[in-house]
Amino acid sequence: MHTDLESLNTYAHDETEDLHFLPAVVLIPKTVDEISKTMAYCHQHCIPVTPAGARTGLSGGSLPIYGGVLLSTEKLNQIIEIDEKNHQITTEPGVITQVLQETVKEKGLFYPPDPASRGSCFIGGNVSENSGGPKAVKYGVTQDYVLNLEVVMPDGAVIWTGANVIKNATGYNFPGLAVICSFVQIGGVVTEFV
């Protein structure tokens, strides 16, 4: 947890140089349970929560414009599983995109979205902003590679939004909808991706 002014200033901006919003506190959880408890508490007390990753974006999406809690995903940085047979990766949001790309390449797989900041941006930010890059012309953008999301909702409930299959006709495309609308906009925190 950070409450000192120097730390708060570090988290008060992204790569948009002219935007600066100071949070009241910065929390850096290590588990989904910590996020769930934080979200439930903040929801009960009407405290705004802004999820943030590496803050390399240019849209202001990770800025705490209402103050409150900035919830950093930097400690949620594990690649949980690489399923070579089904060509699927399960990862936490704080994994650096280039690290993910290099790790799957070692297994003979390919993760195409390649934003210019891939050496420092987190996969969570890529999903939240639906990042692309030069390879998007041929291979598509991030939403084209998201099958399922684990999301901590504002009340602390933990849900999964989809299924770990490419063909899934059991209802709405919630992972795609979540990427397009971004759970950040409705107050959820994405904690795992497939």
What is the role of each PLM region?
Residues 78-82, 89-194:
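FAD-binding subdomain of flavoenzyme oxidoreductases
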Residues 49-54, 110:
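A short, small-residue-rich loop immediately preceding and capping a beta-strand
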Residues 1-40, 44, 57-87, 116, ...:
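N-terminal flexible segment immediately upstream of the FAD-binding catalytic core
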Residues 3-4, 52, 100, 114:
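Residue-level detector of family-conserved "landmark" positions at structurally sensitive sites
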Residues 53-56, 96:
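Ser/Thr-glycine-rich phosphate-binding loops at phosphate-binding pockets of nucleotides
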Residues 31, 53, 125:
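Conserved phosphate-binding and hydrolysis motifs of nucleotide-dependent enzymes
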